[in-house]
Amino acid sequence: MQKKPTSAYVHIPFCTQICYYCDFSKVFIKNQPVDSYLEHLLEEFRFYDIQKLRTLYIGGGTPTALSAPQLEVLLKGLTKNLDLSVLEELTIEANPGDLDADKIAVLKNSAVNRVSLGVQTFDDKMLKKIGRSHLEKDIYENIDRLKLAGFDNISIDLIYALPDQTMDQVKENVAKAIGLDIPHMSLYSLILENHTVFMNRMRRGKLPLPKEELEAEMFEYIIAELEKAGFEHYEISNFSKIGFESRHNLMYWDNAEYYGIGAGASGYVNGVRYKNHGPIRHYLSAVEEGNARITEEYLSQKEQMEEEMFLGLRKKSGVSMARFEEKFGRSFDELYGEIVRDLVQKGLMQIEGDRVRMTKRGLFLGDTVAERFILE
């Protein structure tokens, strides 16, 4: 009997605007079959007969692009058969400017206990430049409303190294973020993805991005300021006050299995990584036929070990060598000892007791270091 995952990701692909940097599975909400989508999504959720989850994460797209009644249908449908005494964290992503009093009332009356706001930047001109429709004032209004409704576990996403962004603008953003008095932040450098407005502009030479040295300086400044303000840098892009780490995201970095529900969602169940149909009408038909998945990949032990390292090294706490050996029945030193010693010598990794982890410099070079753990 295989152990069932205790986490699920639920994808709501609708947006009220399409941001210039985003390549996630999403569509503009107008004229979309939203109610039918929610029915099919809940049908897919029921198919897995999920009764116990530790973490549930509703992302997008923009879940709060749904109307208050639609949000209620979604939240009630997802939690109806769940044992809520086991559910530690139910996060919903929200857009500043989308969260009116009715939607907050729905969240308050549901099992949601964590809200993640896509702030991106506090600069109104920059918000317009990156295709966001909210304003700085909406951020403060939404956070005040959420706090008034009793939500204390609030997170924001910020992006740095944006087009034409200066160090002073980053400093101002960080100061404003700290001033919100919330316990969690995710900070990402702008990554150019294919099929986005920004990638098309860059290819035409029309996207003035900060140089790599300035981006590194921004990253170092962000870490130093947030640590000074009492945040722990617990994962490459994530900072939290003690006890407010994102349990759902820690589950990903611990390389645990999870259900992926909804159009374009990815999941990892019984050693199989899968992806669902992305286009909404394809997804609806696939659910009706009894299988929402479009791709499935069985991971070999080699691939599982590589993923254990790639994901685990994103965390400040790194990877436990004993847990690795217990999970895979292989000697960590035989597989990775030489590589780790080389990276320690280069100042990119350190060994602390049973754990191997990245240094600050290693964290900045993240993927370059992780690539060393691909097994030949």
What is each residue range found by the language model?
Residues 355-359:
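Minor-groove-contacting beta-hairpin "wing" of winged helix-turn-helix DNA-binding domains
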Residues 329-344:
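Short amphipathic alpha-helical interaction segments
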Residues 361-376:
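Short, amphipathic alpha-helical interaction segments positioned at domain boundaries
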